[in-house]
């Protein structure tokens, strides 16, 4: 389990730990094309829409969960108060993207990921501000936000390849979390801990 600070500066190291756990759980036992993992990210985006649509919102103080030392108590509270809420599904989107990035190359991830995401974040914010669309963006429905993520990620995949597409998804999720006022990094932290407790392939086929 990653023991460092959960912040955007450490995202490459966090992603590598996510990938190690995914490998241990059997998600990379079979060699599959990148489209498989991109499709799984799309499925998480769909789950985020459905959770938001159903009003499934996390109300527990995540610091309480983070500081819970008893694994069984943590697991029980996570499943009852966080799991399948829309913020949790948002964390899954980023976790899957980081997993795929780490599989693509840990060395490159350590060297370039944080700078690439920082540049993308600045570019996205500057574009929205320049066009006077930041406030409009904040008012978008969740389905609209997800549509724009998928549309642009597809374009980025064609123009810049898998890494560009995955980095764009993470960048958009960061902005979504900020504008909806939830702590994405803390949700990633508790989901990583929970995922380490889960069975092989999380009891699913893939």
Identify the role of each PLM range.
Residues 1-206:
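Flexible "arm" and connector segments at domain edges
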